[in-house]
Amino acid sequence: MATWNRPHPRLPVAPEPVAEGESQQPLGRELSEANRFAYAALCGISLSQLFPEPEQSSFCSEFVTGLVKWLHLSETVLPTMMAFASGLGGKGDDIFAQTLLKDPILKDNPSAISQDLLSFSLKDGHYDARARVLVCHVISLLQVPMEELDILEEVFLESLKDAKEEESETAEESRKRKEKRRKWKRYLLIGLATVGGGTVIGVTGGLAAPLVAAGAATIIGSAGAAALGSVAGIAVMTSLFGAAGAGLTGYKMKKRVGAIEEFMFLPLTDGKQLHITIAITGWLGSGRYRTFNAPWMALARSQEQYCLAWEAKYLMELGNALETILSGLANMVAQEALKYTVLSGIVAALTLPASLLSVANVIDNPWGVCLHRSAEVGKHLAHILLSRQQGRRPVTLIGFSLGARVIYFCLQEMAQEQDCQGIIEDVVLLGAPVEGDPKYWEPFRNVVSGRIINGYCRGDWLLSFVYRTSSVQLRVAGLQPVLLQDRRMENVDLSSVVNGHLDYAKKMDVILKAVGIRTKPGWSEKGLPLAPGGLPQEEPLQPATVSTDETIHQDEQKQGPAPGDSLKSAIPSSASQAQVPAGLDQSTEDSLPAAAAPAEGHLVCSHGVGPNPLGCPDCTRETQESCAELD
């Protein structure tokens, strides 16, 4: 829905400050009546397209009703707008968007609609995830860069901070930028004040209300500042950012909850934002990957980001087991790969190499323990989010391996509650050891407002091995697409990026870019910060394949992907990459024998996956279905 990697966004054009004594009203009301109608109709039709589920109908109706009043439209147009929100308006959103762009006010500054719609969405002190998804959709129709929404949200926060930024010595450009921001602060706050002296909505969180009100007096006048310092204003700020503004950093598990021994949020950034991101690590390794925040150093989804610290002792045991099994079996697996190239049918029938089964006890116990605990942690996370510990603002969840499993069970738990809507904006599950059957993902449509991203790798033999030794599930989301028929569902084939399960931690920067999540500039593909001008000289990676549910469904009906198919496995160009467990450390990979690289011309299965010790996941599923007696 949003494109995050855009260079140097421009600041929105700031309107001239309103002179003292002049009437102040939201920008939307300054449009002509016809364009106010087009504005409301655009939002109504967009809501029907984004949230057609019956469970979302009340939100759509309330949003449209409030918007009609916000724009001072006649009540006679309300039935028409309700019809649009119910899906009776067809797909005419682009027509209304083009009509708006012809308005004299918006012709040179289409981002003004973003400001007005954001002001309306925040007027009650709540920032519903569905409202943010709608704002993103509308500004994309108006061809406004998504970065401008981030700037607008940032300006809303800055507008109520009583902090005077010092001008740098290089300064003219910085000074002009700040002047533009000051103009926007004042203009945006007009939209946050109700005509007639109603409550002004503050969105700072964690700041003393009287101090904030004092700083705001110079921007919005003494009357508005008095309202901001009132009990109602403080209540709204608390609602948006959580109790006492502490948010997630203020949460600590006071006592053991069920089987959970450790659960806390660690800040990845120092900033505040109107939407937050929570990253969840799947295991703890050795060296630089022994901390929870190590894989997420390049993440830049929002200015307020956290990582979840959970069950460190058990995740460390799991990480050690993963590294042990990989380093100890490197030579054996490489040789087994050659042996089973021709006998892939036997392997697909779950007749695993005896040498693999002999070391299963190394990984089975810590893996089984973490499988259970990740489910409990996910349920606990769901209750925290449902209690609005983070405040009333959108949340994005990103996790890999067992961290993705935490997200899966969090969504599953939230889906059972009636008030689960409007909290989660996007979720990203990478290499998830969870059920891939779409019937298990269907309830998530009621929880997630934006995107449900499933990043998978068909050749992840380690995930195939460890998960199938502890579960009878044959369709694993981390190994293949989830065929959920919904606009939210996005499947991203990471086979060209992820060579082994441990790559999810080691190549997180590249993976985030592949799934469309913004990252910090100046980070190498291995997750290491780069010195200026120190870009690594590497061969470009093949782009990961992004597929929608419709494309996948068509592909499933074929015998195998043809060269021109829209969905195809992004397998490495070198056959050796499909053979050698690439999750190994570099030192281990260098010591692999020459036999690890199979000869050219080995057969590739009908699903496009080269031979590996466990065979193709799809082949395994097909064979297992025909041999149900095998366990």
From Swiss-Prot:
InterPro entries the record matches: AB_hydrolase_fold (IPR029058), DUF726 (IPR007941)
Bilayer topology term: Multi-pass membrane protein
Subcellular location: Membrane
Record keywords: Coiled coil, Membrane, Transmembrane, Transmembrane helix
Region Disordered: start-end pairs: 1-26, 523-631
Keyword Ribonucleoprotein assigned: no
Coiled-coil region(s): 153-183
Name of the molecule in the record: Transmembrane and coiled-coil domain-containing protein 4
Source species taxonomy: Eukaryota, Metazoa, Chordata, Craniata, Vertebrata
Protein family (similarity comment): Belongs to the TMCO4 family.
Gene coding for it: Tmco4
Transmembrane segments: 187-203, 204-220, 228-248, 343-363
Compositionally biased tracts (Polar residues): 571-590
Listed GO CC annotations: membrane
